[in-house]
Amino acid sequence: MDAWRGMPRWGLLLLLWGSCTFGLPTETTTFKRISLKRMPSIRESLKERGVDMARLGPERMALVNITSSVILTNYMDTQYYGEIGIGTPPQTFKVVFDTGSSNVWVPSSKCSRLYTACVYHKLFDASDSSSYKHNGTELTLRYSTGTVSGFLSQDVITVGGITVTQTFGEVTEMPALPFMLAEFDGVVGMGFSEQAIGKVTPLFDNIISQGLLKEDVFSFYYNRDSENSQSLGGQIVLGGSDPQHYEGNFHYINLIRTGLWQIPMKGVSVGSSTLLCEDGCLALVDTGASYISGSTSSIEKLMEALGAKKRLFDYVVKCNEGPTLPDISFHLGGKEYTLTSADYVFQESYSSKKLCTLAIHAMDIPPPTGPTWALGATFIRKFYTEFDRGNNRIGFALAR
């Protein structure tokens, strides 16, 4: 989803399949499984094409020192996408499901071909939908990697076999970088109404209002072994969680406040020593982000402890040193959630140098949301995550 409407943190991205369903709640409509697909991130696509990100310039690819008071999302590293249908008959779009933002948007057929990103993506054509209703209110969404703008429209959206009437953004202006290389078309915000631009009711709120779910929760599973493009990248469950993908019971942490998927954190340990956040800090849980991020000062201290070297936008170690790096533990709700080096180090197979990138970034988020850590797919792959709207809390269980 930055930032943090997450890090567009993102991700992170899901594949939603299903037919339209209406009616009163039943056993078949209270629990919806949604398959996820994994893709190369925009950053990976750039590197695979031999693009030197340093040459793009910090003004084009800035990922740090965000001055906005809202959470911004950086979709450079988003890896998971899903599908939704918009209109009648449904027009299908690949989207990021992002707990760091609250609006739904897709590219519009009214987007000028002068915007290269629109040429490479599926466009929503209102004239092809019999259920479309005009709104026209202007919409602008700022992300750390650029601004998208357009206007609001209303139509039916089908997600996970559930169909709701939804106000969403038709984007008519979107920057070539990073969106030209993105495999996803748009974004579905899974955040709260307090974050929604234009006072739009978020999609999940509309689903809740239909009374079709057993519980007012949704959960995320990201497959740690999904490098094969044909394998299941992960899963979202609307209305519950899937015991096939986690072990034991959930451990819940209450949100800092209603309106943001942010929880208190009591420390970050490297090995057996608590190195950071000794006096307490905050952590966003961001499905739109692929990496874990913290403030620049915190990440610099962490990287020094790991012996990692900084590149323009990331940190690297020699690959043969990766297995020897210490565990990193996050202290949440009285428990320690530990990542081994195998969880936060990955090798760039397309790099000629034997360097491995750490799935940890620096990100400075200003008040009132920040300073804050953000726990993205690096964390969620290890810990199955349940977002409980009914009780304003987040639950974690060991993924399997």
UniProtKB/Swiss-Prot annotation:
The gene is REN. Residues 1-23 form the signal peptide. The active site is at D98, D286. It is an enzyme of class 3 (hydrolase). GO terms for cellular component: apical part of cell; extracellular space; membrane. Interacts with ATP6AP2. Residues 80-397 form the Peptidase A1 domain. It is found in: Secreted; Membrane. GO terms for molecular function: aspartic-type endopeptidase activity; signaling receptor binding. Renin is a highly specific endopeptidase, whose only known function is to generate angiotensin I from angiotensinogen in the plasma, initiating a cascade of reactions that produce an elevation of blood pressure and increased sodium retention by the kidney. Glycans are attached at N65, N135. This is Renin. It catalyses: Cleavage of Leu-|-Xaa bond in angiotensinogen to generate angiotensin I. Its EC number is 3.4.23.15. One of its GO terms (biological process) is angiotensin maturation. It comes from Callithrix jacchus. Residues 24-60 form a propeptide. Disulfide bonds join C111-C118, C277-C281, C319-C356.
